[in-house]
Amino acid sequence: GGFSTNLESTTMRLVENTNEMYGLQAQHFQHQPELDGRNCRDCFLQRHCLPNSLDDRSRTALSEITAHPKPFHKGRYIYRQNSPFSSIYIVRSGVVKTYYFDERGDEHITGFYLPGEMFGIDGIGRSNYRYNAQALDTTAICAIDYNTLENLYPHFVEIQQQVTATLCEELFERQQSLLNIRQQAAE
């Protein structure tokens, strides 16, 4: 209802400000291929992203298993609730909303993801994604095949540590959000 619309409107303003801060616009990916680095070492989001603290060897290994699909236009799904889990994703530009529908068909927003943030982790340990992931703006992403990523762990402990740290941060942020909601409800 109204809360969801206001939240999306506020999020879109945040995205516009974030994209402006990074100098990002969807046309950069279509008309300026030099900004569309095909490896983590050359990516303009490097310092805001998962590979930020990786050494060159680990960053190269991660780059080799990262796909760069064409940008998703506003409203397009990156994946749908209950679709087979295959990859985790990092936003390069735009914004992604994750949400699910309950048994009654009511939508529940679970997150908004901005450039440099990881999503798709809702499928880890399962065979399918729990949520829908939808582009709210023209959105470019990096897709990391999760099975291949797991196969790198024994050889690149640093990658495993960074992914684990990112997952822990995501859990912490969700806990903080729940605490904030509970505090607001109590007031």
Regions found by a protein language model. Name each.
Residues I109-E173:
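Cyclic-nucleotide recognition modules
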